């Protein structure tokens, strides 16, 4: 509502239909005020949907970039992105094409529905686990407040723990088998919390998906 002109910009037009669908899920409508429990359930549903989270970040990047570039006329001299930010940056700067078409490709692929999320078949195959076996929660991500060198040393003997992100020299994300990750945390003796997302990112266990 603050920047109505952006809806006429080509980049926004290319993404409008998908952004409209995302917005309805991100900001649910109700004739009654939702309870705290209902809101928490919706938040949990959103956080567990890796593809939806990816598309939300891309959509916001496109919208904010349109406001800054086309409304305020601020043109970047360079751009970079970290993790999903790299994908968001590429769409927001028009390096990659039509977001709505890309969204259709994302949603028709098994990459985010079963390969890296939900049943996590890529991990099962990498670890030699049966797809039919009910393993419960066999993958988890953790945020550690620890020195990166400590973490690298601590995971050397753990075959199912991966260092997935180095946010800062003292803020690290590891992922893998929960029991093995917790051994690493206990051995280091650092503060750590489970990450709010549970999909597979940035590690050897998803190497089979690189071609896609």
Where would I find each of the regions flagged by the language model?
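Short, surface-exposed "cap/lid" segments of acyl-processing enzymes
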Residues: 1-28
């Amino acid at each position: 509502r603050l920047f109505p002109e952006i809806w006429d910009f080509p980049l926004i037009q290319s993404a409008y239909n998908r952004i409209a669908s995302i917005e309805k899920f991100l900001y649910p409508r109700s004739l009654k005020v939702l309870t705290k429990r209902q809101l928490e359930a919706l938040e949990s549903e959103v956080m567990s949907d890796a593809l939806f989270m990816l598309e939300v970040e891309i959509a916001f990047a496109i919208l904010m970039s349109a406001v800054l570039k086309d409304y305020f006329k601020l043109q970047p001299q360079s751009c970079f992105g970290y993790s999903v930010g790299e994908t968001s940056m590429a769409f927001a700067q028009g390096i990659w094409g039509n977001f709505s078409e890309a969204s259709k490709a994302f949603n028709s692929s098994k990459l985010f529905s079963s390969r890296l999320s939900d049943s996590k078949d890529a991990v099962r195959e990498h670890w030699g686990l049966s797809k039919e076996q009910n393993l419960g929660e066999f993958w988890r991500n953790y945020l550690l407040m620890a020195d990166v060198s400590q973490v690298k040393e601590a995971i050397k003997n753990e075959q199912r723990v991966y260092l997935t992100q180095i946010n800062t020299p003292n803020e690290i994300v590891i992922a893998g088998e929960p029991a093995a990750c917790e051994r690493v945390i206990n051995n280091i003796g650092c503060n750590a919390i489970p990450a709010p997302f549970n999909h597979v990112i940035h590690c050897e266990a998803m190497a089979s998906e690189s071609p896609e």
